[in-house]
Amino acid sequence: MLKIELPQIPSQAWQCEIGKTWDNPYTVRYSSNLDDGPNHGMPLGGMGAGCIGRSPSGDFNLWHIDGGNHTFQSLPACQFAVFEQPEGGEAQVYALNTNAPEDGSLSRWSWYPQGKGSYHALYPRSWFQYEGIFQSQLICEQFSPVWAGSYQESSYPVAVFEWSIHNPTDKPITMSILLSWQNSVGWFTNAIKSLDVKVRDDGSPVYEYQPRWGDSTGNLNQLIQDSFRVGCLFDRIRMGDEPKEGEGQWAFATTTNPTLEVFYHTRWNPKGDGSEIWDRFAYNGSLPDYQDETPAEPTEQIAGAIAIRFTIRPGKTKKIPFILSWDFPVTEFAQGINYFRRYTDFFGRNGRNVWAMIRTGLKHHDMWQNKIKLWQEPILNSSRYPEWLKMALFNELYLLTQGGTLWTAATETDPVGQFGILECIDYRWYESLDVRLYGSFALLQLFPRLEKAVMEAFSRAIPTADDTPRVIGYNGASAIRKAKGATPHDLGAPNEHPWVKSNYTSYQDCNLWKDLGSDFVLLVYRNYLLTGKNDQDFLWECWDSVVETLHYLKGFDLDNDGIPENGGAPDQTFDDWRLQGISAYCGGLWITALESALRIGNILLANPPVNPNLERENAQEEITASLVLFEDWLQRGRALYHDTLWNGQYYRLDTGSGSDVVMADQLSGQYYAQLLGLPDVVESQYVKTTLQTIYQSCYLNFHGGKFGIANGVKPDGSAEKENDTHPLEVWTGINFGIVAFMILNGMKEEGLQVAETVVNQIYDNGLQFRTPEAITAVNTFRASHYLRALGIWAIYHALNK
């Protein structure tokens, strides 16, 4: 007989005490930006299926059920509770949240004491270990079926809560575990169906989002007893069979057997004192066994609860699984623009399939758990990676589910669906290309088919045009939305039509940016080269856009010297930082992009596409002509770059500003050249000198290396201008990219020191599971839930090279 044991929590998991309070958490830099405070835990849910977050305090407080939109608010009635009574002893009972509701509701409940146990997280698994209160040893492991290479289960809107209970005493203990849930069907859709876009105080565009929070009219709860499964299903009266956004179901369930007693109450008032379920549960761990499917009246709230009671003998261990699932199959963008979610490819699209997902979860959760372990253990057990990096590698993947993530149902054009992660909640547009230059390394290595799908969407967007005029937030100028041939900054926003209407951001005129076209070419070649070098059709899909956008970018080479010039207004990823003339950053990316285009073209000449529709008549002649032209541009640019910008210690910011700032990411193009096995942009001796200068000036000289690498400071670590914004920020994802570059150039020890500093900034200061773009030297942050921080997987790649 298989012996049941308590789970072994990996030592690498991030941990804090249950109910941790933060004395001085970092706070947001701009008041208009999002700052939900530090009480964030690991999300649960599938990629693109919506997710929920359960904090280290034990409450469910993050709700990303409506694709692309963010709600942070605790629902106290969504909660576990535990009753324990040793034989001949006193009973004790607690709701497993350390924070009582602020509105005074559920006043009959007893709330778990702060500090009695620990919370651990190693995405996609997390654990609550309860200590010092109960006589039994009690651990709840939480996870969703997300693991590398899973293009099916990783999309499931399912959360598993596996309870492990061990009796270390010499007497039997009666235990009861209760799960309560509030019916929120219908809440998660925007009540404001408007395309109005406003400009915030930081110049970035924002649209209004107001969920139908608390609108439970017509909601009803049902007890489901299905063979050995028992649970509560949360539904809503709706008109017609076709679900709209926000329509669907929630459910939770557990398994039962003769050793377990099941109790239920399917309709209680979560805004009252909670006595309907608490009094019985606190008395003996039971519930009144009350069923009521009456739909909720206007202003009424309803919740349901199930309790499982059992006796555990001395020295024995028991496991009790609870499965929570939701089925909201439709994501609506602009009014009438609807997409089905990826999981509907496996469970249907009518919004009535939540119980099928519950059954799947109860049947397969052990297998899912093992799949996650098999994926994680080679990294956790390897001596190649420091322990703090193992923790951060997995926990930064929280954004795969919590990044406002979209993953649509498959189509003939997109056989694994379309995919997108927001730049962040404050900058609410998808897959910003400059950001994903580093931020896409996780998707590349873990879900390469999705990474290619994103780049194919950019390829389709490049030849499009949108002449709609807009006001630019940075300077008030007017500009068109999207120029034909320009690589778009992003793939659009949740309030319009992602993938179809690109270039949502209007803080700068991104048609003028000098890095985006190069970024596109580099990522196309990278995605081919680092995923097996056998998907020539992917290159064929993107080739025409490679050619078109390089021609577009060359149009900014006003003196025809071989390198496009920056125009003075911020026109690259550091979009509050003026570059003028030839710049080290954009010039290096341009040279490496041309090298990549030459490689792509030669691959296509040698490899006709599998899909004949991808190759036009005369394609070979057109490719050959493009290669001749690109080679000419490349040779002229190469001759110029080093001699124009090198100052003996590092590459100058640009040729037009006269600045002596050391730009930390100045050799991003050289990093990509080394990554892709391309000819160097600059010789290795200059690379090493530059990296040593960056390490000294931007890290050690910037507040003694306390925060990480600053984007741009003078050689002594001081500011060029005291009121600079981007230059004086430490960007998490940029730091991770630079560290990967350092590792490739023999500075592993220094690089890992930098990365550990940044990781500690995140996880020691209340920024866990909301990693920001930027940290400042005055303990503030900007742009939480940021995509670029997934660039920590570039460090993983560099350590494996």
What are these regions (language model features)?
Residues L2-P25, S31, W127, G132-Q135, ...:
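Acidic/polar, glycine-enriched structural segments that form the non-catalytic walls/loops
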Residues A81-P86, A91-G104, N167, D215-N219, ...:
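Aromatic-rich carbohydrate-recognition surfaces in CAZymes
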Residues L433-P463, D519-L522, W540, D544, ...:
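Active-site core of glycosidic bond-cleaving carbohydrate-active enzymes
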Residues P43-G58, H70-A91, A121-L122, E131-S136, ...:
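Short, solvent-exposed loop/edge-beta patches enriched in aromatic
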Residues S57-N61, G67-I133, D235-N284:
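An extended acidic
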Residues P415-G420, L491-L512, E565-S583, G648-T655, ...:
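Acidic/His metal-coordination segments adjacent to aromatic residues that form catalytic metal sites
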Residues C51, S55-P56, N167-I173, W181-T189, ...:
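A generic secondary-structure signal for well-formed alpha-helical elements
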Residues M1-G88, V93-L96:
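Beta-strand-rich N-terminal accessory domains
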